[in-house]
């Protein structure tokens, strides 16, 4: 819906404002309405505010041409007499602006601004009243373009009809001219004079029709130019969206609609080009002095050809940027020797029936003159041919699926070396495509380029290479600037923050909220930063160590992203992981909650680690906050985080293990928060011969710690410490996660059901791993073994002979009763049922976090 059409649908108060606006305007309302689409399509802002007066002058004369054309159309309709009069009057009224066309541009530009202001006021009023909002011009552009295409097709049909009538008129003239030439009689012959008069009238009518056809072709070309001016910005929008999508922005960037529009526009231009050729032929058959077709057709044809070439050149695009199949989430990174894919497309879907189109690919057509800049060759075939049959069925699409790059050797032997000012991951390379396009006699070489790619030689460089891709596509205004990292610009947080969130939303499904982004902002710029939109340098993003973990910021963040994707995706997407929380914020959150409240946050001191912190309130009103040593992917590969949380044990003062993790922040019971992620629960009614084994995590609490808990500093002192020294790693519980298996306690049917619910033995950890198949028990009488003297009295009747094989690695005397020993979700087919494994002891005391 055009802006003027939306204004007509406004309520009375806003309609009154519109009438008042045009009551003092030189532009009449009826002309504003009749030329609404054309007026709104022109760039009045550039003409009014630009420093180049030529744009205002050109727009002024285009306006006059449009008025004259519309006036000519109205002259054929008797009912449009009033409109025709107003068009002519306005055309005369604006003649004085020929001396200063900028004034006319300013007048219309200000009118459009006032219209938009009235429209915005009306939309706000509708929002306050709860009414549906009017459709904005941006949302209606698709309808606008399609409507224009329909109008152009109608104009084209009319032009075809006019040319047909012109041919008939020219045939009449030729016939009369030949008759006149044959019957040569004295000039005083009345009949001859009459014939000459008729011939002259026929020539005058022919000249008139030629001018009308030429004017119609000019008007059609003007409308086509406007259509192309609408389509090309749409294509630029798509390219900008594609660039952002390459760095994982959530944007839909399909090309099907653009292909339909570009093809329709090209068809109209090619058709007009053919009609101009017909007019040229008519001019060659019959030519006379001041023939409008003699120069007019050549001029129109040149304009059409130029517009077609411009459209075709822009219509050849890279639809899918280069990407390796093994890293689909990180395009624009290529590895030497590895295959990658890329797709090009011509949006003008017109191909000769007998012409195949071949695209050639090359790399670094115009490489930068930098010392040490690497050079590459395309190892596989650098051509792709599209037959007419495939082009008609799938479109003009060239899929390169097996391209491979190899580095050129420098000197006589060995690989090329990179000793220039740029690192390997800062070199930018451009892959180019060329196709020789031919259609209806028009031949043109079309070229297009990919976005700059980073070429690595080892997958260990993938992370920092992605940082380069992210930085370039976020900040570079020039997509061909291969020397971007010679002097990389700083990134404003307003751009960088959303881009970091895109990495999570695209790769794991959920982006970063405002609190998480705020933590990252403080980590990069400090809590004292008061700048509204601070700037971050490339070195600070990827190279400079970031306290407290002594890791570059991007390395730290990318390792977390990898950890979440591989092991924590469901927990992250469901909001169970708070994640990016500073230690000071962690303390502020937990100290106000009940004992046992915990949260999950990413460690700031390890590469890809997640830790669990919980609060304990002492009897003397002291608050202690503990953090477990971070779990990395090596740990989580053996035991899911949800199972660690479920079965985590902390030894109390009486040396009895208990789980201190009771409520997920703010107050969600642990099993309610994580129950849906637990492994399959065990049927407690099932009778088993052996106790299942499972991995659990247990931390020791030292006696002196229990007797003398550390007192947390008051909040002001804490904040002062942060401002002066920065955050330092908190004391954490060191965990050695090691699965310990115990096999084959033959308890007998009498004691088994009792011990399943009461016995949970704990043994001293050891690196020894034993797996022993235990035979089925004999169904005959069982002799009573002599009990071990160190066993508890309630276990001395057990047969411990089959357990001798564990004597070197298991201390039976440390087995302790502690609840149900069965771990849910175990496979009962091929595992050895053993007693519950021991805790994983810590290599240091459990200390409260300083923050």
Swiss-Prot record:
GO process terms (BP): cell surface receptor signaling pathway via JAK-STAT; defense response; defense response to virus; negative regulation of type I interferon-mediated signaling pathway; positive regulation of transcription by RNA polymerase II; regulation of cell population proliferation; regulation of mitochondrial fission; regulation of protein phosphorylation
Positions carrying Phosphoserine: 283, 287, 753
UniProt domain SH2: residue ranges: 572-667
Taxon lineage: Eukaryota, Metazoa, Chordata, Craniata, Vertebrata
Region named Interaction with SFTSV virus NSs: 316-486
UniProt name for this protein: Signal transducer and activator of transcription 2
Disease implication from the record: Immunodeficiency 44: An autosomal recessive disorder characterized by increased susceptibility to viral infection, resulting in some patients in encephalopathy and infection-associated neurologic decompensation.
Quaternary structure note: Heterodimer with STAT1 upon IFN-alpha/beta induced phosphorylation. The heterodimer STAT1:STAT2 forms the interferon-stimulated gene factor 3 complex (ISGF3) with IRF9; interacts with IRF9 in the cytoplasm. Interacts with CRSP2 and CRSP6. Can form a homodimer upon IFN-alpha induced phosphorylation. Interacts with IFNAR1; the interaction requires the phosphorylation of IFNAR1 at 'Tyr-466'. Interacts with IFNAR2; the interaction is direct. Interacts with ARL2BP. Interacts with E3 ubiquitin ligase DCST1; the interaction results in STAT2 ubiquitin-mediated proteasomal degradation. (Microbial infection) Interacts with vaccinia virus protein C6.
Interaction with heartland virus NSs: annotated span: 316-575
Effect of residue 374 to A: Prevents the nuclear import
Keywords: Activator, Antiviral defense, Cytoplasm, Disease variant, DNA-binding, Host-virus interaction, Nucleus, Phosphoprotein, SH2 domain, Transcription, Transcription regulation, Ubl conjugation
SUPFAM superfamilies tied to this protein: p53-like transcription factors (SSF49417), SH2 domain (SSF55550), STAT (SSF47655), Transcription factor STAT-4 N-domain (SSF48092)
Residue numbers bearing the Phosphotyrosine modification: 690
Listed result of changing residue 148 to Q: In PTORCH3; increased cellular sensitivity to type I IFNs; fails to appropriately traffic USP18 thereby preventing USP18 to inhibit responses to IFN-I
